[in-house]
Amino acid sequence: MTYPLVGNYGTNDLFNQGRKSFFQGYVISELCDHPSNWRCEKTLEQFLDEQDVPVLTGVDTRAITRKLRNYGVLQGVIVPAEMPQEEVEKLLATPEVHDQVATVTTPEIYTLGNGKYHVAVMDFGIKQNILEYLASFDCHLTVFPAYTTAEEILAARPDGIFLANGPGDPKDLQPIIEELKADRQEAYFRHLLRSSNFSFG
C-alpha cells in the first residue's frame, strides 16, 4: 500500500468480501495502532493476525512502486530478520504460483437467493457484494468452482451465465478458456446468446 499511514479506520467483518483473506503478505509504510471509526471492531493488525497474513512495516512503499513500474513483476518474500541468507535465496528461487484463481475459487457449488431468474456464476474470485447485488434483482444464483465443466453448468439449465472477475493473468488460465470455448459450441449456450437470456462478465 502506497498511502503513508494504513489502518486508520480499523476493520469490521461486516465489510468482508470473501470467505477469508487470500493475499500472502502486506507491505506498508506505517501501521495505525489506534483507529478512529465508529464501526471499527478491531485494528488492522488484529485482523491480519487472525488471517495469518504477515506484515512488513517501516518500508518506503512508494519507492517499491516505482521499481515495479520500471521493471515489472519482481520476485520477493517476507521473512524473519534472523533467517539465514541461503534460506532466503531458496525461497526466492521457488517457482511462482501462476494459477491464482485455483486458490480463491469456491471449493464446492453453492446457491444464493431465491429469485425468479436462475443465474449460473463461475467463481474466479468473486466478491460477496456482487453476488448479493445480483440476487437483489430477483435472481437465484448457483455458484460454480472455476474449473467446472461446461456440461455441468449447462445441466443446471440457467437463464444466464455470469463470468466473475478474479486475480491473476487470463493467459495463465488456458484450461478454463478452452472450456468456455467448448461451452460456446453447446446448443443450449447458443440459445442463451440468441434469446432474451444473457451471458456476461
Q: What is each residue range found by the language model?
A:
Residues 1-157, 168-172, 178-179:
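RNA-binding accessory domains that recognize and position tRNA/RNA substrates
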Residues 159, 165-201:
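Cysteine-nucleophile active-site neighborhood
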